[in-house]
């Protein structure tokens, strides 16, 4: 009896975990895959254009409707974008006026540069709470940054 209850609880936990992982309404991090893409107020070409997003613009997808995705960005703005314009490339935007870039994942590593607020980079690698950033094209690394200083994956 006790083994049956444990088995039922474990099975329920696994099913719920899988439901969360495959639920398209759960937020996932992606980016805009083309330059100057219209972000709209609704899931239609007839919907009002709210703004244009640059290549690599990091977004958190909250839901999908047909060929459209609804997202939220780092300042809390929301909008709809045509799904083929969304990329699975992980990108990040710098959230602070100046973020130190280091040669490795930690404050003990040498300072190699700084990134400024609003700069967008590709996330090349993760190590704990640190992300290795690089340029969108060519994967040339620029340095490691503490993930609390960025919005992205």
Predicted region positions:
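Bacterial N-terminal signal peptides that target proteins for export
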Residues: 2-13
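Bacterial N-terminal signal peptides
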Residues: 11-21
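Sec/Tat signal peptide C-region and signal peptidase I cleavage site
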Residues: 23-29
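Boundary regions of SH3-family modules and the immediately adjacent low-complexity/disordered segments
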Residues: 31-66, 72-105, 110-112, 120, ...
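Short, charged beta-turn/beta-strand-edge "cap" motif at the junction between a beta-strand
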Residues: 64-67, 126-129
């Amino acid at each position: 009896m006790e083994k049956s209850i444990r088995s039922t609880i474990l099975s329920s936990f696994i099913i719920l975990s899988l439901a969360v992982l495959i639920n398209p309404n759960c937020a996932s991090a992606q980016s805009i895959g083309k330059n100057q893409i219209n972000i709209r107020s609704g899931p239609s070409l007839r919907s009002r254009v709210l703004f244009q997003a640059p290549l690599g613009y990091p977004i958190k997808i909250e839901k999908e409707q047909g060929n459209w995705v609804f997202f939220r960005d780092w300042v809390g703005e929301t909008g709809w974008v045509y799904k083929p314009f969304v990329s699975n490339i992980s990108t990040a935007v710098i959230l602070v006026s100046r973020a130190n870039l280091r040669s490795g994942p930690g404050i003990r590593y040498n300072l190699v540069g700084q990134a400024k607020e609003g700069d967008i980079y590709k996330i090349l690698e993760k190590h704990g709470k640190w992300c290795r950033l690089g340029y969108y094209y060519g994967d040339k690394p620029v340095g490691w940054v503490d993930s609390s200083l960025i919005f992205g994956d």
